[in-house]
Amino acid sequence: MQTIAILGSTGSIGTQALELVRLHPEEFRVVALTARSSREKLFEQVREFRPEVAGLTEPIPMSEIPEDVRFCRWVMGEEALRAAAAEVPADMVLVSVVGIAGLQSVMDALGANRQVLVANKEALVTGGHLVMDAAKRIGKPILPVDSEHSAIFQCLQGAGGNQPVRLLLTASGGPFRTWTREQMQNATRAQALKHPNWSMGAKITIDSASMFNKALEIIEAHWLFDMPPEKIQVVVHPQSIVHSAVEFADGAVLAQLGVPDMRVPIAYAMTYPRRIPTGSKPLDLFSIGTLTFEPGDPVRFPALRLAGECLNAGGAACTILNGANEMAVAAFLRDEIPFGAISRIVEGTLEACGAMPADTLEDIFHADLEARRVAKEIAEKLK
């Protein structure tokens, strides 16, 4: 039996991970659960899974914690993440919190010699070099939970140590796959939130519409698989059945296919290298009939170009891209800027911030704050 700490247990990834624990009680024991502010949902999870540690990063008084969940240790604020990631003994730590706080949690878990399952994009986007160095020091791979990176990771298990020459990173294309750049400029919030295949939170759904989600995944893939950005090709695949693929020197391409169901990559990370039933529907290729593929378009979706530019620039460029995009998306979701302004704000922030170092966590957090400040100023002018 494996013990698991889940950071961000009330979100989409966290709740699906707990579904798998519920399905396989003989496989897993939950030792820590954290949430940001969904206290009632967290209380329910604590009652069911009875962890040793539970916490809320948005603190509440201990008097507001129900008597029947006080059997475990409660931690509030940022300390909740640190306690769950590094203090409570756990075989593995699933980091599914949103935002750059995930970087600190990943580093804390690695520092405590934990097996880390990463469902937080910011950890690798902003601090990929630090994360991979720390993982190398303890001799444990970073296990990706993103469906695309999990697909690549799974394909590489059958590669016999052969290194790929190209990664094919698939993308649904989002709701604006067939729109012109001009049409996208003034797309509404409701239009951008209509994802064709996946049910996700508002931020990641907007990122899918702008393809900044795929830009972040290019950066993640670079660090996870030590692949230069020019060898990572985005392939638009509207059916979301091929989750990604790898190409080898002999021309062979290995791909991972399946219905869109996040329980599959979550379960693979939780049981690696074994596989367990997930409750996912079997893939029926006959009912799908046709799989189609298109090249990613960096003209209509500037995010695809910016990912490679930021990786080649080095330093804190990827951190600046990430922070600026978060601020721009937040402004768009408040109906303060048009959809087309998101990429303009990110490009403007990258230009204004220039070269910044990313040698330490402090450097990265400073660059993130500066990017957010600059992006907010630019967004204010576009209102």
Place the predicted regions along the sequence by residue.
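Catalytic, metal-anchored helix/loop core of enzyme active sites in primary metabolism
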Residues: 1-383
